[in-house]
Amino acid sequence: MNSEKPLFSFFVTSDVQLTEQDHVSHQKLASALQDIHEVDPETETLIMNGDLVNNGERKSYEIFQQIMDENPHPNQVYYTIGNHEFFKNDGNEPSIQRFLDFSGLEKVYYDATINGYPFLFLGTESWGPVGSPTKDSAVLSEQQLQWLAEKVDVLKQENKPVFIFLHQPIPYTINGTDIEYYQNGVIQDKEVRKILSQLKHAFLFAGHSHWDLRYPSMLVKQSTNFVSSGAIYNTWGLDEEGGEIVTDPAGSQGLYVKVFHDRVQIIGRDFSTKQWIPEYTHTILI
């Protein structure tokens, strides 16, 4: 890897899908945190982009926090809500509240400034019903979209990259999002696209699909840079019938992002083998 020192760096992960009884999920989270620390012990920021827990249970959040406390990790950890945070299936409000209690946030959408660069975090505000083709979709309220539009209206005046995080990917972007299940992945996808297209250098990171970062087109450069961040719990891919299937139950992946004054470098990391993913090394000029 290039020895030039970046302005700053951060890691992006998603889809830990931890539960109390699934000790493999505990081990994978701990292993990922340890590898992140070994790769760059000086990085100060980690984004965990949804599906932190598999069932939305408060006990799962408690174990998640315990593992975080027991392992080295960057000082600043930012969370987004995914679809699995709703899987206790007791309604939107209690599901969201458990996530907010865990994360210490006031809303599922918020912003931060990290090393002088803007970060925007989005999140679904509704889930279900079970059996619906939009059960796992991201639903963004008018208030959230208005908030995003107002943030972008200010940020579009700058030439800095803007880093945005939403658990579900925008349909018809990264590989796999043309599959039927993902076609309704973000109900307000057209609105989000339109808002983000005003930015000169927008990076929208998504998890959810678990698709192996070794596949082509897991980062797509359109008016916005659409970025897949892999998954900690396992990796998926295309099956022989045009659907998707688990390709590696032991797979565990995430991203290492380095920001320079003239470019952003995004590199895939295999936490299970503690190796870089050469197929997922991207440099986007600013």
Residue positions per predicted region:
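N-terminal active-site segment of His-dependent metallophosphoesterases
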Residues: M1-I63
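Active-site neighborhood of phospho(di)ester-bond hydrolases with catalytic His/Asp-centered motifs
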Residues: V12-S14, T45-D51, V77-N83, F163-L166, ...
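Short acidic, glycine-rich surface-loop motifs adjacent to enzyme active sites
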Residues: L155-N175
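Extended active-site neighborhood of metal-dependent phosphoesterases/phosphodiesterases
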Residues: E57-E158, I187-H201, R214-I266
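A short C-terminal boundary segment appended to hydrolase-like catalytic domains
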Residues: M1-K5, D248, S252-I286
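Flexible, glycine-rich surface segments
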Residues: P169-W211
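Short, well-ordered beta-to-alpha junction loops that form the rim of enzyme active sites
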Residues: G123-T124, F165-I170, G207-S209, R269-D270
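Surface-exposed cleft-lining segments at the edges of enzyme active sites
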Residues: L18-Q21, D51-V53, S126-S141, N175-Y181
